[in-house]
């Protein structure tokens, strides 16, 4: 049985999923990116299964090489965008922690909560 057309189609689907994930990361659609990750992992597993059954010919490997490069480039870009997002989130968590510490230390003075008033006079 010739698996070449099915293998090529599986790789094309992986390219499509990879491009979708890059677009979602670029557009900062983080929830959608996470939701699409399982389909990407499943596509990778399908390719692994197909290549375990029958190793692709040298000709097929040459045809698949540009797809693999594109997938790896997309994955690298997604990782960079995710790192930027993680740094942003770490900064926000740090700011929140500082605010909580300040409120804890200075927010309750003598039983009264300090809050700005509209009219002081």
Curated annotation (Swiss-Prot):
An annotated GO cellular component: cytosol
Name this polypeptide is given: Flagellar protein FliT
Disulfide-bond pairs as recorded: none
Pfam families in the record: FliT (PF05400)
HAMAP family: FliT
Role: Dual-function protein that regulates the transcription of class 2 flagellar operons and that also acts as an export chaperone for the filament-capping protein FliD. As a transcriptional regulator, acts as an anti-FlhDC factor; it directly binds FlhC, thus inhibiting the binding of the FlhC/FlhD complex to class 2 promoters, resulting in decreased expression of class 2 flagellar operons. As a chaperone, effects FliD transition to the membrane by preventing its premature polymerization, and by directing it to the export apparatus.
InterPro entries linked to this entry: FliT
Gene Ontology biological process: bacterial-type flagellum organization; negative regulation of bacterial-type flagellum assembly; protein folding
Record key words, sorted: Bacterial flagellum biogenesis, Chaperone, Cytoplasm, Repressor, Transcription, Transcription regulation
Subunit structure: Homodimer. Interacts with FliD and FlhC.
Principal place of residence: cytoplasm
Region (FliD binding): 60-98
Subcellular location, record wording: Cytoplasm, Cytosol
Gene giving rise to this polypeptide: fliT
Regions crossing the membrane: none
């Amino acid at each position: 049985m010739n698996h070449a057309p099915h293998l090529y189609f599986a790789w094309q689907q992986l390219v499509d999923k990879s491009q979708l994930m890059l677009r979602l990361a670029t557009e900062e659609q983080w929830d959608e990116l996470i939701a699409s990750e399982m389909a990407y992992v499943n596509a990778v597993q399908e390719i692994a299964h197909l290549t375990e059954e029958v190793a692709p010919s040298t000709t097929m490997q040459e045809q698949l090489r540009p797809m693999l490069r594109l997938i790896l480039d997309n994955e690298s870009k997604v990782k960079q965008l995710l790192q930027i997002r993680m740094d942003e989130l770490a900064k926000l968590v740090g700011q929140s922690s500082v605010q909580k510490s300040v409120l804890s230390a200075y927010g309750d003075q003598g039983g009264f909560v300090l809050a700005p008033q509209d009219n002081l006079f």
